[in-house]
Regions:
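Short hydrophobic alpha-helices and adjacent helix-cap/hinge residues
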Residues: 1-131
């Protein structure tokens, strides 16, 4: 059965996905995931399991790809809010913002290690391709 699977910390269960052809993992946008990034990337590399994350750093460090908000853009937008607050605006009067700039990073080194090919048309959509 395909779909979500609960996290299981036992070593033999870590590679359960690797035995299921066509499976992969999507990392949640969560501080725990970021803090355990090294162990997660090591586990998926050893198990040859594709991983997609919302964090650019994951793709740089070895996941298959990342797609998520552009962190630099978020920090720039946050700085403008800090500036407005320091100039006297009340934080409660500022509108809520959501990310509006997203980036796709594809790691071809990982793709090759996993034996996966990625279409050129998809690579053309990427903001960054790691070769």
């Amino acid at each position: 059965m395909r779909g979500e699977r609960p996290c299981n910390r036992t070593a033999e269960k870590r590679y359960e996905l690797a035995r299921d052809p066509g499976s992969g993992l999507i990392a949640a946008g969560d501080p725990f995931i970021v803090n355990t990034r090294e162990a997660i990337l090591k586990t998926v590399a050893e198990g040859k399991v594709p991983l997609v994350s919302p964090y650019r750093q994951f793709a740089i460090e070895g996941s298959l790809m990342s797609y998520g908000p552009d962190s630099a853009d978020i920090f720039r937008r946050s700085a403008s809010y800090v500036d407005r607050i320091l100039k006297g605006e009340l934080p409660g009067n500022l509108p809520t913002q959501s990310p509006d700039k997203f980036e796709l990073v594809v790691n071809l080194k990982t793709s090759k290690a996993l034996g996966l090919s990625i279409r050129e048309s998809f690579l053309l959509l990427a903001d960054e391709v790691i070769e």
